[in-house]
A protein has these predicted regions:
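N-terminal hydrophobic/helix-forming segments and targeting peptides
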Residues: 1-172
Length: 172
């Protein structure tokens, strides 16, 4: 599982795939092969051999989120990157990467998370990244200025924590 765990630990949100791309290129070169990068960021490697050619392909990037706005209370309004529905994202632990490569952890949650103090009509609304789903940072921030002082601002990529578990030989 070692290398699989290494791969999952590399944040690779679509649009921020260079770290995993570099990792795969290094692995190919450590095996003694030369890698080539396509104009769209793909990696090719000729493993040699004779006979019919075989092509193996795989995605290196992953679905995630992006900071769309820093709310006045310091939470983050986000946009999906890829096909991540708000229902599936809710409760996920995340890593927010700043432009200068600092990383902060947080959690995706409802904007009004407390069911005992939220009006029924507000709580009943469908989940939507634009209106009622936010990322709360694991930092002592209370307003937009404090969040932005961390380097977290519009356009920062947000990766989901992979939560790797192996149970009875099954990967979760």
């Amino acid at each position: 599982m070692g290398q699989f765990e290494e791969l999952l630990a590399i944040d690779s949100t679509t649009g921020d795939f260079r770290p995993i791309q570099n990792y795969v290129k290094e692995q190919i070169e450590e095996m003694g092969y030369q890698s080539y990068e396509t104009h769209k960021g793909g990696i090719l490697a000729d493993l040699g051999g004779t006979g019919n050619s075989l092509v193996i392909t795989a995605h290196l990037d992953d679905i995630g989120l992006m900071v769309r706005f820093v709310n006045p209370d310091g939470t983050l309004r986000v946009a999906k990157v890829g096909g991540l529905s708000p229902e599936d994202a809710l409760g996920e632990n995340v890593r927010v990467k700043t432009r200068d490569d600092r990383v902060y952890t947080g959690t995706v949650q409802k904007k009004f998370a407390s069911v005992h103090v939220t009006e029924d009509d507000v709580a009943a609304k469908p989940l939507d990244y634009a209106t009622n789903v936010v990322v709360v940072l694991d930092e002592d921030v209370h307003n937009a200025e404090e969040t932005k002082a961390l380097g977290v601002d519009i356009g920062c990529f947000i990766a989901l924590e992979p939560r790797l578990q192996v149970c009875n030989g099954y990967i979760k």
